[in-house]
Design a protein with these regions (language model features):
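Long, compositionally biased charged/polar accessory segments in the mid-to-C-terminal portions
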Residues: 1-5, 110-298
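Short His-Asn-centered micro-motif
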Residues: 9, 60-64, 84-87, 180
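Generic beta-sheet signal
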Residues: 4-6, 56-62, 81
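Low-complexity, highly charged intrinsically disordered N-terminal segments
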Residues: 1-14, 21
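Short, flexible loop segments at boundaries between secondary-structure elements
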Residues: 82-105
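Cofactor-cradling patches in redox/metallo enzymes
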Residues: 43-53, 60, 68-74
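Glycine-rich phosphate-binding "P-loop"
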Residues: 17-46
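Gly/Ser/Thr-rich loops at beta-strand to alpha-helix junctions
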Residues: 13, 60-70, 90-92
């Protein structure tokens, strides 16, 4: 409503993750959703600076290192700049993501038109990788036990080396806001539904002022910082832990077809095949939530 610009990570037409700026409300949705890939900053720092110098309001979102990079590039504080970082596990390789998409398109004989790394198809407590294809009849909703991109990421095989000794792992940040998942929303507010909730840390007076201005648009509850970090914020303080096989994995990534990578690093055992089939079945017969509760108990 103030003719401002928002910058953040989106998928371009080539399904690459890139930073992009817009002042169009209908494009804001492009920034939604987790993207477990290192985004290309491109010329967005320069574009943001030009807008700031004209007095335009700018909101720039990204990983902590990207926000620090922006601040370093600008060399000064701007009253009309709002920065938002997120708690990230690490920045996976764009090369891996490109090869993953190529593999899926060959496997399904169809073009991928959309990617959701953390889709809520089965609800907030079990997010999946969802792929959209040109042929809308193709359904792809798989969690870490079946999806290779998620598997490689969460097993520490594909994040860049700097993520393993991240200098931005701290509660205090250079940004105005830090956002991350609130996995234990039910302990804070009973009305939270299966769509989930987000923690918001405010680091500056500017951030506080904007939060006060916007808070009537959403449901919120104040929380204790240390309690939140203990329950949901371990990645705020801990760097990604690399797999001992990471170096081998990247050598193989450049030389082996994607299906050979799966066979070498995560062979499809009979038990994995059973688990992959069980979850969609439980969901369709209406007992998936019961299955997830039993899994947590075990």
């Amino acid at each position: 409503n103030q003719n401002g610009y928002v910058f953040g990570a989106i998928y371009n037409k080539k399904m690459e993750v890139v930073h992009y700026g817009t002042n169009k409300k209908e494009e804001i949705q492009l920034f939604r959703g987790s993207k477990y890939v290192q985004s290309k900053i491109g010329h967005t720092y320069q574009e943001a600076k030009k807008l700031l110098q004209t007095g335009c309001l700018v909101c720039f979102s990204g990983t902590p290192c990207q926000i620090a990079g922006l601040k370093n590039y600008l060399k000064k504080d701007y009253a009309n700049l709002i920065t938002v970082d997120l708690v990230c596990r690490g920045n996976p390789s764009p090369l891996l993501f490109r090869k993953y998409l190529e593999y899926q398109q060959i496997k399904y004989k169809n073009k991928v038109t959309g990617v959701k790394f953390r889709d809520k198809y089965y609800g907030y407590n079990y997010s999946t990788m969802t792929l959209d294809f040109e042929d809308e009849r193709i359904q792809y909703h798989y969690g870490m036990e079946a999806d290779l991109m998620l598997k490689f990421f969460f097993k520490g095989l594909c994040s860049k080396p700097a993520c393993h000794q991240c200098v931005f792992k701290s509660i205090e940040r250079v940004s105005d806001f830090t956002i991350f998942d609130c996995w234990n929303a039910k302990f804070y507010n009973k009305i939270m539904d299966k769509a989930g909730a987000t923690h918001v840390f405010i680091h500056s007076q500017k951030g506080f002022d904007y939060f006060e201005y916007l808070k009537s648009y959403f449901v919120y509850q104040k929380s204790n910082v240390q309690k939140v970090v203990e329950q949901d914020g371990c990645m705020m303080l801990q760097s990604a832990i690399p797999s001992t096989r990471r170096a081998d994995f990247f050598r193989d990534l450049n030389n082996l077809p994607f299906d050979r990578l799966q066979a070498k690093y995560f062979p499809l055992t009979l038990m994995r095949k059973i688990i992959i089939k069980m979850k969609p079945f439980f969901y369709h017969i209406g007992i998936f939530s019961i299955y997830m509760k039993l899994k947590k108990m075990l």
